[in-house]
């Protein structure tokens, strides 16, 4: 059994290539949250050296020409017309291409998070393959949709039209959110897709596998390619007489032994966090509920905790377990190669400037700090727009990544130092944040410009404080590591005089 598990891990690693392949996504309806906000959490996992930059894209007027992925050294040769008048929007993007924005909002208050890499059945891809040469990929989704979509539903519709006409260059899931609705979009094959509106009183979690089951044509809670059911019937992955109600995941998504160790456990773990009374086995992934009502209303803190999870306190803990046979069997949510994770929060009752906020942890969430980035921000402190795949002394990404790399040389010894300091920082920040938002709203009613100035001053101050703390922690861990190395090398020369 152990040999089969290890073989499946090796096989999955080989398949996972170079895109943002191993993400985990959580969506929470407004009536399932503790304050009436809609929440989205996602980790972006690929390569630890993939530095990120924070970008604010200004509004544009009278544009002509084409968006070109290739022109930015993107994934392929996908092109799409630029919007004549494009809205201002934000992204956290790849430092090299400035594409592949993991998360962002536009000036209409509409946001997206993407993508979740998913895999279709091989037999269907032979009939309707991905358009790897010129189809849309995660590199281009944010920069094509955010400047033009005025609602979550419009974003779903537009992406669906692109997939049906130009094709998907890969399999993906994308979150769309606005003041009223929360949608999740999944590709099936190169030109097939569906999307589902998230129930207000439930949450949804997915991990590198198609998870949407129900799809009903002409139902306002669903959208999809016009022949998505017929295609499955024609290609014998769905038989209405035998299978009953159409199940998109069962009809389109790959499901094999790799999912048992790589994908199912993450979904199961999150559901066990939010519904402790639910008893499930990691291996029963196809039986996991798609949507669930949490046993207690969920908060931003709950989603942060989920993004930091690594089977904590069990024999399967990827970093702290003493059981070498079990510690690396199941893929955790928080992994070292995560280059950023985020929690989006939409509070429609507040002005968009503070009502749309994204909490971002750069690098490995378990060893990072979540800071709130409000949509009213007009800029960042030094280092946020800098970076490359080579470590430097300027990029904010490398400020956090250097500390995480040091800690992972001896996780058990060094991680408590970092985690305790960041937990204290976040707790104190929550108090400051509540006070700031109260002051902002009082000012906003009298003078919006002064309120926005306050927002930017507050935000940049906490960016700097977190950066300073991280430098302090890096020096502290480096000092500890130096002392440990000194003791280790002295022991090698025991009885000798250096």
Stretches found by the model and what they are:
Residues 260-327, 331-336, 425, 430-445:
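Accessory, solvent-exposed terminal regions and/or long lumenal/extracellular loops of proteins
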Residues 155-164, 303-307:
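Short, well-structured alpha-helical segments that form the helix of a local strand-helix-strand
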Residues 148-154:
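Short, charged, surface-exposed loops that flank catalytic or proteolytic processing sites
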């Amino acid at each position: 059994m152990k040999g089969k598990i290890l073989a499946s891990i090796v096989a999955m690693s080989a398949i996972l290539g170079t895109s943002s392949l191993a993400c985990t996504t959580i969506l929470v309806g407004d009536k399932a949250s503790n304050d009436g906000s809609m929440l989205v959490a996602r980790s972006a996992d690929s390569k630890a050296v993939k530095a990120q930059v924070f970008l604010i894209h200004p509004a544009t007027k009278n544009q002509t020409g084409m968006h070109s992925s290739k022109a930015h050294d993107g994934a392929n040769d996908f092109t799409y017309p630029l919007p004549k008048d494009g809205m201002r929007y934000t992204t956290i993007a790849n430092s090299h291409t400035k594409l592949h924005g993991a998360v962002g909002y536009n000036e209409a208050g509409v946001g997206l998070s993407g993508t979740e890499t998913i895999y279709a059945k091989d037999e269907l891809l032979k009939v309707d393959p991905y358009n790897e040469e010129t189809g849309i990929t995660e590199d281009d989704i944010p920069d094509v949709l955010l400047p033009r979509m005025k609602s979550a539903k419009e974003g779903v519709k537009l992406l669906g039209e692109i997939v049906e006409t130009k094709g998907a260059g890969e399999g993906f899931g994308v979150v769309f959110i606005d003041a009223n609705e929360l949608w999740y979009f999944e590709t099936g094959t190169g030109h097939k897709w569906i999307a589902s509106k998230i129930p207000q009183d439930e949450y949804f979690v997915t991990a590198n596998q198609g998870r949407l089951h129900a799809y009903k044509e002409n139902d306002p809670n669903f959208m999809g390619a016009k022949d998505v059911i017929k295609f499955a019937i024609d290609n014998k992955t769905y038989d209405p007489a035998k299978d009953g109600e159409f199940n998109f995941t069962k009809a389109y998504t790959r499901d094999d032994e790799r999912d048992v160790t790589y994908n199912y456990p993450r979904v199961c773990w999150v559901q066990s966090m939010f519904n402790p009374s639910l008893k499930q086995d990691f291996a029963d992934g196809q039986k996991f509920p798609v949507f669930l009502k949490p046993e207690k209303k969920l908060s931003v803190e709950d989603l942060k905790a989920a993004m930091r999870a690594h089977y904590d306190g069990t024999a399967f803990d990827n970093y702290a377990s003493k059981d070498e046979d079990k510690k690396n069997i199941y893929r955790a949510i928080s992994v070292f190669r995560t280059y950023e994770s985020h929690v989006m929060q939409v509070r429609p009752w507040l002005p968009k400037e503070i009502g749309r906020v994204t909490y971002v942890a750069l690098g490995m969430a378990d060893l990072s700090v979540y800071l709130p980035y409000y949509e009213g921000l007009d800029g960042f402190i030094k280092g946020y727009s800098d970076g490359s795949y080579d470590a430097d002394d300027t990029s904010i990404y490398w400020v956090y990544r250097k500390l995480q790399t040091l800690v992972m040389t001896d996780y058990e010894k060094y991680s408590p130092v970092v985690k305790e300091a960041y937990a204290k920082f976040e707790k104190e920040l929550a108090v400051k944040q509540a006070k700031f938002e109260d002051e902002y709203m009082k000012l906003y009613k009298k003078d919006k410009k002064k309120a926005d100035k306050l927002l930017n001053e507050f935000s940049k101050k906490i960016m700097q404080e977190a950066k300073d703390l991280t430098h302090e922690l890096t020096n502290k861990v480096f000092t500890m590591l130096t002392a440990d190395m000194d003791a280790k090398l002295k022991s090698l020369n025991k009885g000798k005089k250096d």
